Structures are given as C-alpha cells and as structure tokens.
Amino acid sequence: MKNNIEYEKQQEEIRLHNKIDTFFDNFTIGTLLNKSGIRKMRGISPVTMLKAIFILPFEGNNFFRGIVSDNRQEFKKDAAYELLKGPRYNWRKLLLFLAVRIVCVLGLLTDKDRKKVLIIDDSTYDRSHSKFVELLARVYDHSDKRYLRGFKMLTVGWSDGASFLPLDFVLLSSEKEKNRLQGIT
C-alpha cells in the first residue's frame, strides 16, 4: 500500500513537471528571457532556474524549502538569488512579452465579438509589519479609509471579462517626503 502511494506521488510529480515543460516550450520562455536580457552568465541556464522557481507553488513549497534547503537542485541558492536580483534583467519586459503571447492564445479561444479592455488599478500594497524596506511610506488606502505602511501598486492589465492578465506593474512610494518612512539606501 505504501509503495502504491509513493508511486502515485512520483507519477503526479512527473505529470506536473511535464505540464510546466510544455508551458515553457509552447510560450518559448527561453527566447523571451533572452529578449529581456536574461541570459546565462556562467553555470546553469536561466530557463532551468526559472522552471525550478516557477514550479514551487504548484508543489506546495516556498522558496526556502524548494531552493535553499533542497539538495536535488542542479544549482545553489546563490545562483537563484543572483538570477532574481540581477540589475540588468528586465523582468517587466518578460512579463509583457509573455502576456502578449497568452493574450494571442486566448484570442483564438474566445468569441471575436467579446469586448477586450485594458484595466488600470492602483491598489494598496500593505507592508504594515515592515520597518526597513526601501522607500516604505505611509499611503492612504481608499477602501479602508485609513493610512497604512506600504506602497501603491499600479497595475495595467488586459481583460476579456473572464480572464485578467497583468501587462505591467510598478510599486509607488509616497510623493511627499514627510510620508516616507524609509529613504533610498
């Protein structure tokens, strides 16, 4: 019985990895990474690292358990941190390229008469428990009608009424210097 459960678990993990591989292949994530300036500097390819990071929530893992303390990965945690923090990598461009490809696929699956819209949203990004985050500010939350620690998150997204895809986003601090709790370090 125990072997059967282990076998099913392994098969489910293989199916999940195959689905992620198919997604990365169908949307040519490697090409999009390259167009976004995210290239292999040394060691492991960025596609391999991004797949390993991308699959974490589907496996029920966080970054620490899936990358930092997992010795089965082909790369070390420092390589993953270097990929995510690379100052020359244009993650916003990657998001836009990927969103455009997904919008094209959704366009084939939906009715031509369906209305498509761009949505601009400025939600509050709450960081109430943070103290030393760069440009942390007191921002006004219009839904709760109070000030809180955090940022404004400006998001531009595409929607067809049933789906929403973020195209770009930015975290905004307060324009007023007196409302900023932390400066630039």
Predicted segments with their positions:
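Conserved, well-structured functional cores that handle cations and Mg-NTP chemistry
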Residues: 1-185
